[in-house]
Regions:
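Conserved cytochrome P450 K-helix E-x-x-R motif and the immediately C-terminal K′/meander segment
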Residues: 49-71, 264, 357-398, 403-405, ...
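Conserved cytochrome P450 K-helix/beta-meander segment immediately N-terminal to the heme-binding cysteine loop
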Residues: 409-439
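Terminal signal-anchor or tail-anchor transmembrane helices
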Residues: 1-32, 466
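Cytochrome P450 heme-binding "Cys pocket" and the immediately downstream C-terminal segment
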Residues: 337-339, 461-500
């Protein structure tokens, strides 16, 4: 019998053979120098991708089960990339203190290349001079105490207006029992996008008094939704680079299209800001950036790219993160009605029913703050945090971690450590009034780091907490909340870049205050 080969046959065979040799050497290299244990179940070429990147099991749960078997520090292989998985707050503390500089960089994912202006987008930028300059600008001009106070009117006015619109919607659409069914994921999303886009670009896209183009508003919402979906996917090129040319699933093509659409929208904003720049007034962050970076070049990025990428990074992160947090907080309250009732009692005691909640009231709402902390413990915006990459060899728990290893901190596991948290799976805000009353979420208590820790900690923590407390307090004060037939809320998670609730959050609302207060 004769065998014939196509012209490409030998070359493809050679490529696979070379890759297999590389794979075996890579594994052998990883076994030296007292390497951490590697989880079982790895396959040639793909490593543990079949366990982590597909199927019905969520990655944080699978990795948590691996930690039960292999311990709080172990490695997996995502294609050709060795990845360290840490499931202990003590090890997280060592990483973000002793080895903080070494773990402050990001892997270069395809999404960051095509949708993040070739890694110019702040959230995805590698650690270095460019990242430090942009972070300093953001910290001073947008998220400092002074800046947050100057922008307070945006948070307050948007929250008040959203409550008014919600009341008017109830008044027009309420049923015979005086209730209105509202899908709160969308409502929270509109509110938070209005706040962050007003702060960044001076536009209000959603609601009855929106001042932006409705078509542009829908495009903006869609492109951000596509961004988060695509950025949260396992892409072949990120794990097995030599197969990237196949573009399995067409994800790279979609990323390029989404990146172009995002750029088209924000380029329009930038041109509008340039046209009004001669007035000398600075009303939003894009105005500030125009004067701060015009005529400069950081790491070969032109000023326009720096402005657009930074603004998009803040809009995507700020809007989605707070929305996710609010959705889970309300979901937990509806599944724990006694906690909801206690929160409303606290509001009635400190604010009463003759006025609305002010931002200055939040400091007095101790139980509400405990609810927020407990929600962030159980449902941080990302169960696996943001991926890091070691930029130098390190020694952790007596194990040698080579440069180039990727890092995952399993917050889902560390935040449920029974050695730290009594009844760790239960929603108990009271723990932050007693045993854990001195804990905060700003990266100092490594048992609770929903925003990350170290140099790469989320720069918008204070903004997120301001929004989370203000919106939640106003909603609980202004409306009674329940579910159809008093059913429990489905708590299924939709895994991705952030942990959004997989199903709608349908809530029955009715006013608690006099109509003159809306």
């Amino acid at each position: 019998m004769d065998f014939t080969f196509s012209k490409t046959g030998p070359s493809i065979t050679a490529i696979f053979a070379l890759f297999f040799i590389f794979y075996l050497r890579f594994r052998s290299k990883g076994s030296k120098n007292n390497a951490p244990p590697e989880a079982g179940g790895s396959w040639p070429f793909i490593g543990h991708l079949h366990l982590i990147g597909g199927g019905s099991r969520l990655p944080h749960i699978t990795l948590g089960e691996m930690a039960d078997k292999y311990g709080p520090i172990f490695t997996i292989r995502l294609g050709v990339h060795r990845t360290l998985v840490v499931s202990s707050w003590e090890l997280a503390k060592e990483l973000f203190t002793t080895w903080d500089v070494a773990v402050s960089s990001r892997p270069k994912f395809l999404a960051a290349k095509h949708m993040g202006y070739n890694f110019a987008m702040f959230a995805f930028s590698p650690y270095g001079a460019y990242w430090r300059e942009i972070r300093k600008l953001i910290a001073v001009e947008l998220f400092s105490i002074r800046s947050l106070e100057l922008l307070k009117h945006v948070r307050v006015s948007e929250t008040e207006l959203s409550m008014k619109e919600l009341y008017e919607y109830w008044n027009a659409k309420k049923d015979g029992s005086g209730q209105l069914l509202v899908e709160m994921k969308q409502w929270f999303g509109y509110l938070n996008l209005n706040v962050i886009i007003r702060m960044i670009a001076g536009k209000r896209y959603f609601g009855t008094t929106a001042d932006g183009d409705k078509i542009e508003a829908r495009q903006c919402q869609k492109v951000l939704r596509d961004f988060f979906h695509l950025a949260g996917l396992f892409v072949v090129a990120d794990t097995i680079p030599f197969l990237g040319w196949l573009d399995v699933g067409g994800y790279e093509k979609r990323m390029k299209e989404t990146g172009k659409e995002m750029d088209r929208i924000v380029e329009k904003w930038l041109e509008e800001h340039k046209q009004k720049a001669n007035s000398g007034s600075k009303h939003d962050f894009m105005d500030v950036m125009l004067s701060a970076v015009e005529g400069t070049a950081l790491q070969d990025y032109d000023p326009g790219t720096i402005i657009k990428s930074t603004c998009l990074s803040l809009i995507a992160g700020g809007g989605d993160t707070v929305t996710v947090m609010l959705v889970w907080t309300v979901s937990l309250l509806l599944n724990n009605r006694h906690v909801l009732k206690k929160a409303q009692q606290e509001l009635d005691i400190h604010i009463g029913k003759e006025r609305r909640v002010k931002e200055s009231d939040i400091d007095k709402l101790i139980y509400l703050q405990a609810i927020v902390k407990e929600t962030l413990r159980l449902y941080p915006a990302g169960f696996l945090g943001s991926p890091r990459e070691f930029t130098e060899d390190c020694k952790l728990a007596d194990y040698h971690i080579p440069k180039g290893t990727r890092l995952i901190i399993n917050l889902w596991k560390t935040h449920r450590d029974p050695q730290v948290w009594f009844d760790p799976l239960e929603f108990r805000p009271e723990r932050f009034l007693t045993t854990h009353k001195d804990f905060d979420v700003k990266g100092q208590n490594f048992e609770l780091i929903p925003f990350g820790a170290g140099r790469r900690i989320c720069p918008g923590i204070s903004f997120s907490l301001h929004m989370l407390h203000l919106v939640l307090a106003n909603l609980l004060h202004a409306f009674e909340l329940s579910t159809p037939s008093h059913e429990s809320v489905n708590m299924t998670v939709n895994a991705g870049l952030t942990n959004m609730k997989a199903t709608p959050l349908d809530v029955l609302l009715s006013p608690r205050l006099s109509r003159t207060l809306y």
